[in-house]
Amino acid sequence: MFVSYKWLQEYVNLDGMTPEILAEKITRSGIEVEGIEYKGEGIKGVVIGHVLEREQHPNADKLNKCLVDIGEEEPVQIICGAPNVDKGQKVAVATVGAVLPGNFKIKKAKLRGEASNGMICSLQELGIQGKLVPKEYAEGIFVFPGDAETGADALQSLALDDAVLELGLTPNRADAMNMLGVAYEVAAILGREVKLPETAYQAGAEKAADYISVKIEDPEANPLYAAKIIKDVKIGPSPLWMQTKLINAGIRPHNNVVDVTNFVLLEYGQPLHAFDYDRFGSKEVVIRKAYENETITTLDEQERTLTTEHLVITNGSSPQAVAGVMGGAESEVREDTATVLLEAAYFNGQTVRKASKDLGLRSESSVRFEKGIDPARVRLAAERAADLISRYAGGTVLEGTVEENHLDIKENVIRLSVDKVTKVLGMSISKEEMVNIFERLGFAVEDAERELVVTVPSRRGDIAIEEDLIEEVARLYGYDNIPSTLPEVTGFAGGLTPYQDKRRKVRRFLEGAGLSQAITYSLTNDKKATAYALEKSFKTILSLPMSEERSVLRHSLLPNLLDSVAYNLARQADSAAFYEIGSVFLKAEEHTKPVEKEHVAGAVTGLWHKNLWQGEKKPVDFFVVKGIVEGLLEKLGITEGIEFAQSERKELHPGRTANILHNGSLVGFIGQLHPSVEKELDLSDTYVFELDLHELLRLDVPEITYTPIPKYPSVTRDIALVVDKQTTAGQLEDVIKTAGGKWLKEVHVFDVYEGEHMEEGKKSVAFSLQYLNPEQTLTEEEVTKVHDQVLKALEDKYQAVLRG
């Protein structure tokens, strides 16, 4: 919102306030002033001149020799190339010694042999943007009204001695998107009165209702529509003071009728539209939803195709405007317009936003409807515009306003607890001070003992609850005046929750094992969403995704993690080892919200140990990654009930995949990528794992207890078993641990053999078993007895035979 300092002075006394001081006070009250632009800054020496004579330059077809009175003793000769310069005009003259934008200095000169003592200026040459210059002066010099004083300061007449404050309004402060709204705010800050504009036209004898009727077909989209009729208008330029206000606000002047509607828009925040009554096509205004594929040519000369979601203003048959967005070219005000149909309405913001977005049209009007206007100002703005049109276009306002109204405008009444203000702000503010603040804001206040009953005017739609009033008290009292205090709290030792502590252990262990942390998007595409999922789930699809690649919430961490691995390998990395701790999103039923669960996943490829001087290089394999997972589970104290069971997953290599079970429940998986997946990602020999961290970190695990170093020696026995190929080492190990009892302290595989001298369908698995009694030395007989129990259990369960 651009706010003219000089225009603001018409509504609020700004004595003692420079633009800088005012900007600081506004900012400290909660509305940020993003900048101050001083119009005409650096320009000097420009006056209003009177062209006494104009004749063709004797030596140049496109130059004019002008004699110009600039308010000095003698007129000066100026050579001017503007095509529209003429005798009798009042123009802007940069005198000799003047400075124009860009530090351009005016000097005496000779142009094609003729002296030129100054320069007749266009508005662009005075620093005004070309898009804001009225069309009739776009290609030439600007001409002042005939009553402009010769020799007067041209910058002052063009409001180029003004300062414009740019306000950075938050979405809730739509009330400040107009001059009166800013005036109320500034008056409240400074403790001064607001001077409201007066309306004083004399209505004609004829009644507006005899010329027009109003019918609303969709009260929800358009609850209020008011129309006024102004006859016998004369279309021409608007007064200079109005044009300069529009230009400084960033709006291009057009004519006295259109400029009035834009002026009132800026003044009241109420969008208006003026139709040419005679071109409107009927004596009724019907506001309805457009028909499918109905068309309208808007004021920008573009044909727009409408849908049934767009609200239009019609003459009963054809659209004449897109409600709240832009008028139609068919009934626009033109030079020969004699009667004006003036529209003031309240349109639903969502309806306007929909049409504005669909049609690619965004206007000053649509922005205000979208953010919300004050319904109480609809009629006030219509009256103000009618008064200005009758004053500056010479028209007669017909008696009455024709309207259809479905609005019940009520002011919001809120009860404010004085004690709550003290509690929220952390300091005591007297009731009298609060009353003063609300009255400065223009709110009505009633005293009710420990409460204040505050009536909020409809212009402040952002104030709805008690906390909003407390914010107003804080703003106007001054945030700088509220003392800083530290909260009184009882000291206590901080720390991590058990879950956080375990989560940190996971991260530290994996990083210690050589994996680097990655963080990937929680969103993926439809194809990848369900890949590698630990459990079945319906997809959670975004309604308005930014891209198809980020349209579905993930069920697994691996798809995006593998993309990161592939990305790194494609950039000359020979190995990659990544892990991620993040959320997956699962839902058991389609039309429910997803449950967010934390998982940990890893992906490793390439060399685990590079070729060093003391040994050969070692590539990553299944058992490297399995060892990482086992070490992680052990770090978390989860050593009992864990089983790696061979399984199949379509994304993983058959025969090199295992589910990870805890007491029979699936908590994760491990495996090598399927060759087809590796080919698709341009990877080779890549191993992955994923664990349900949400479940694992909530398991009750036994506390670690101290065990002294054994005093007595252990006994080691090695066994090589011949078993079926389908029997896993893990299955054999489980039997050994169960049968070995309390004296079996350690068991591990040290050899697996398949090949020559081995029966078809068989393999040899060799284990090393360590027996230990912490209380005494085990005898040979005791060890043999337990060892035989182990062998018998293996034979009974898996028909294991000692290899000879």
From Swiss-Prot:
Keywords assigned: Aminoacyl-tRNA synthetase, ATP-binding, Cytoplasm, Ligase, Magnesium, Metal-binding, Nucleotide-binding, Protein biosynthesis, RNA-binding, tRNA-binding
Domain of life per record: Bacteria
What molecular function does GO assign, one term?
ATP binding
Q: What class of enzyme is it?
A: ligase
Reaction catalysis annotation = tRNA(Phe) + L-phenylalanine + ATP = L-phenylalanyl-tRNA(Phe) + AMP + diphosphate + H(+)
Q: Which family does it belong to?
A: Belongs to the phenylalanyl-tRNA synthetase beta subunit family. Type 1 subfamily.
What name does the UniProt record give this protein? Phenylalanine--tRNA ligase beta subunit
> What organism is recorded for this protein?
Bacillus licheniformis (strain ATCC 14580 / DSM 13 / JCM 2505 / CCUG 7422 / NBRC 12200 / NCIMB 9375 / NCTC 10341 / NRRL NRS-1264 / Gibson 46)
